[in-house]
């Protein structure tokens, strides 16, 4: 049996977590199936922030543009499944250049999971993904191309999700 700590501290993700880190399509939909109910979204932050150099690079900004300040709409949330502790910590970065036309609704999500909007018409979206270990847990960072707009979404699987997934 894998312990709670190994889910957080191993250099490689637990085998049982790999499908969740690599899934294409809506993570929201799969988490709701696992929870047996809609996800509860707790907003931690919504507002404008300057992008860091690393975030600019992840969004594909290159050359001299890297040295210029860039604002993004940032949304940070906890996603709850079917218990009192959050399963996933998520951060969504929407560069201002991506928030034009109908994409402006991404600033008005409130307690709606972003997956409801992104995967409303398509089961998958063009993306680039990386997986890394953070102090909070295993994280997938996905750069989506949503109708020609770049969106960077980071989803960290928290200890409670690992415990439930691994049946600890």
UniProtKB/Swiss-Prot annotation:
EC number(s) stated in the UniProt entry for this protein: 4.1.3.40
Pathway stated in the Swiss-Prot or TrEMBL entry: Cofactor biosynthesis; ubiquinone biosynthesis
Protein origin, superkingdom: Bacteria
Gene (UniProt): ubiC
Gene Ontology MF annotations: chorismate lyase activity
Chain's role: Removes the pyruvyl group from chorismate, with concomitant aromatization of the ring, to provide 4-hydroxybenzoate (4HB) for the ubiquinone pathway.
Keyword set includes tRNA processing: no
The organism of origin for this protein: Psychrobacter cryohalolentis (strain ATCC BAA-1226 / DSM 17306 / VKM B-2378 / K5)
Protein name: Probable chorismate pyruvate-lyase
GO BP annotations listed: pyruvate biosynthetic process; ubiquinone biosynthetic process
Family per similarity comment: Belongs to the UbiC family.
PANTHER family listed in its UniProt record: CHORISMATE PYRUVATE-LYASE
Keyword Cytoplasm applies: yes
Record-linked InterPro entries: Chorismate--pyruvate_lyase, Chorismate_lyase_/UTRA_dom_sf
Pfam families, per the entry: Chor_lyase (PF04345)
């Amino acid at each position: 049996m894998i312990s709670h700590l190994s889910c957080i501290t191993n250099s490689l993700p637990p085998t049982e977590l790999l499908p969740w880190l690599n899934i294409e399509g809506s993570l929201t939909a799969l988490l709701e199936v696992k929870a047996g109910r809609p996800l509860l979204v707790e907003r931690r932050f919504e507002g404008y922030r300057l992008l860091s150099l690393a975030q600019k690079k992840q969004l594909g900004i290159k050359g001299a543009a890297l040295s210029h300040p860039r604002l993004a709409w940032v949304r940070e949330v906890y996603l709850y499944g079917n218990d009192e502790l959050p399963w996933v910590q998520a951060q969504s970065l929407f560069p201002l250049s991506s928030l034009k036309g109908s994409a402006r609704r991404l600033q008005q999500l409130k307690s709606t999971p972003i997956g409801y909007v992104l995967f409303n018409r398509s089961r998958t979206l063009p993306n680039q993904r990386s997986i890394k270990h953070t102090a909070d847990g295993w994280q997938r960072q996905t750069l989506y191309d949503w109708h020609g707009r770049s969106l960077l979404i980071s989803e960290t699987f928290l200890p409670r999700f690992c415990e439930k997934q691994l049946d600890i």
